[in-house]
Amino acid sequence: MATKFNASVPQLSRSQLIDVLCSEYATKRSVIIEGPTGTGKTQIGRDVAARLGFPLVYFDCNVKGIEDLTCPQFVTINGVEVVRSVPHEEFGLQFDQPIVLMFDEVAKNRSLIPGITRVLLERTIGSVPLHPKTVIFGTTNLGAENFGDVVPGFVMSRVALIGMKNPTVDEMLQYGAATGWDAALLAAIHEMPGLIDCFTNVEKPEDNPYIYDPRDSSRRSFSCPRSLHNLSDLLHERQYLGDDVVMNMAMGIVGAAAAKHIMNLVTLGDTLPKFKEIVADPKGVKAPDSAGARIISALMCLQRVEAENFSPIFTYIKRLPMEVQALFANQLMKTPTKAVWVSRQADFTEFARKNFALFTQ
């Protein structure tokens, strides 16, 4: 949906941005990534550093000053004592190796912007050039979020400013399944995509009560990928903390509107067969009969299935409606650690052959 917030804003997905930062282009020109709060911009630095094998230098502009870029050093040149600026040790220039230099919240600290701009453009700190293979980029929140993040025009002409798309439901399911998110929470994301939407896609604040919206100052807690990850960690402690504590904390993490709907699915998950029960009796265990319960069960199986128990799990999954089978099969193939072995499972390859259309959607 086109709104006054998102017209003509160039955007790339998170994976596309990582590809850009891992390319030769990023060793010549600097990039500033602008995206909604809580969508994983900071994690990009870790992912780029891991792919390239370079150390990550994380520079948090919220808490840094211009003095954290360089320090004065007294030297004598031609018999004259002068002062020169030398980079702080944390930048690792003394090791003569490329780094991934990330300026997080780059537009937050106005007094720091002139100093950072020189690094972004000239790729030097003080008078010391960075390694020619160094990758430099910054991140910032959307200016429309009213957090004080505004990239000045004189900076925009010196860098590539690009927006980051919100993650899709598919991307969130993949990430959550790979990192052990609560299955009922993943089902909530699948059933309520609005939990991870951005206000720039919403005409009126009341159209999506779950997310941050600068037009509604009453939303102190809200749903976004970061707060949902926080909630997942809490849900893993539900048995110990109890529902009353978890519900109240959930409202403080993702807001009352999101917490209510998510906790309904969490409670529904209590009625489902346990993983070990499915493995022990995949044909006889009671299968869920509601759409939400089926999705929770399938996503729970997706998280825990391994090569040695795949056969009984898949027997159970095939008792569920085709759309749930498709969800399970597609997400399984998109999980790198599981796709390796599932492609060698005879019953899965036969299923894929008969239902080829499910994998081309």
Language-model regions, residue ranges each:
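C-terminal regulatory/interaction module of P-loop NTP-utilizing enzymes
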Residues: 2-361
